[in-house]
């Protein structure tokens, strides 16, 4: 069973905590993307990154001085977005760290599919970025089925905790033999169920922690998740989607 999760824009370098286990699987393709980005002007990159001058300058300098092989941080410790804050991998016990290393895959526009202990360096690149490398019209074409083939294992089970931007990289290549379960976190708003972005990110990270702490190997056990006010809604769920509702205190 594999769990897929989106990366985060905010990243740090931490070479003091834990040494990475390995380089990312697709480092050669990452090098190709790096070279393409370095060939662009600052203004072109600002358009690609869709950010302000300050963030453009920071990331332009990152790519100018980027070393993909030295002073690396384990991916799960480098990303600092909301989901990763609630996963809190820096306080994982050894068994929990081993669990995520075996089960969690972080999908990245720059690196492809990352194991938690793969060594990375901070970058800025989203899967939807308008990039043409070689014959590929965009990053979805560039990565093709590589991320799917990297993630799928003998169990044929994938738990989707990623955003649509990243889960699309996997969904296009699913086969009838695969069991793909998307997890939806929502709450009642009038007579509708809606997903609130920040709460969903919190819950995704908290669910990874829940699965690691409970060493979950069977998807049915995910239904026991009851943190951050969420509970499983069997009436809204199906074999391919597990829905959790957050109860809002009045």
Locate the predicted segments by residue.
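Active-site helix-to-loop segments that bind/position phosphate- or nucleotide-bearing substrates
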Residues: 4-91
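Internal, well-folded beta-alpha domain core
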Residues: 89-239, 243-250
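Short hydrophobic beta-strand segments
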Residues: 2-6, 157-160
């Amino acid at each position: 069973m594999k769990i897929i999760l989106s990366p985060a824009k905010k990243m740090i370098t931490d070479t003091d905590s834990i040494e990475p286990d390995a380089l990312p699987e697709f480092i050669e393709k990452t090098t190709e993307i790096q070279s393409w980005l370095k060939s662009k002007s600052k203004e072109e990159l600002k358009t690609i990154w869709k950010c302000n001058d300050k963030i453009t300058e920071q990331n332009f300098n990152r790519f100018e001085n980027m070393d993909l092989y030295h002073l690396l941080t384990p991916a799960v410790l480098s990303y600092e977005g909301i989901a990763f804050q609630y996963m809190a991998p820096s306080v994982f016990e050894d068994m929990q760290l081993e669990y995520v290393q075996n089960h969690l895959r972080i999908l990245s526009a720059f690196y492809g599919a990352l194991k938690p202990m793969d060594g990375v360096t901070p970058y800025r690149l989203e899967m939807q970025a308008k990039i043409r490398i070689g014959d590929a019209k965009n990053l979805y074409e560039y990565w093709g089925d590589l991320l799917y083939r990297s993630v799928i294992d003998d169990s044929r089970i994938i738990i989707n905790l990623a955003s649509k931007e990243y889960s699309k990289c996997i969904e296009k290549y699913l086969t009838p033999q695969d069991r793909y379960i998307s997890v939806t976190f929502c709450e009642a708003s009038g007579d509708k169920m809606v997903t609130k972005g920040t709460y969903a990110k919190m819950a995704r990270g908290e669910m990874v922690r829940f699965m690691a702490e409970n060493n979950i190997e069977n998807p049915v056990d995910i239904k026991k998740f009851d943190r951050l006010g969420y509970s499983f809604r069997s009436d809204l769920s199906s074999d391919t989607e597990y829905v959790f509702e957050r109860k809002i205190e009045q």
